[in-house]
Amino acid sequence: MARAMIRLREIECCEPVREPGVLTLNERQRLIGVFKALGDGTRLEIFRLIAAQVEPICACEIVDRFAVTQPTVAHHTKVLREAGLIRVSRRGIWAYYEVDPADAEALEAITGTILGRQERVAALA
């Protein structure tokens, strides 16, 4: 039976399995933090809302769109901030959130590494 399986695999048109790129310890820790932060459905949707904006979005706008209180939004945005996904600026008593472009580029590079896409993109260029 084992020989039959080996022969079958030789006949099939499967591509060789590609190994993903190596993650540094910092990249790995960052990804763990990012995935933990986005692992909550409400936080994921808050992040998506913030990321969809051209300008920073006020916390009051986030509260209005979700069935949560202002302290809950503050908690979720704190987790997203600590994961390096967003940044906050203050204007008087209001907090405004946006995706930090530098963090977004770093995150894209890290997720590209975890998915092994950097090599594929470079090969296509």
For the regions a protein language model found, what residue spans apply to each?
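Histidine-centered divalent metal-coordination motifs
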Residues: 43, 75-76
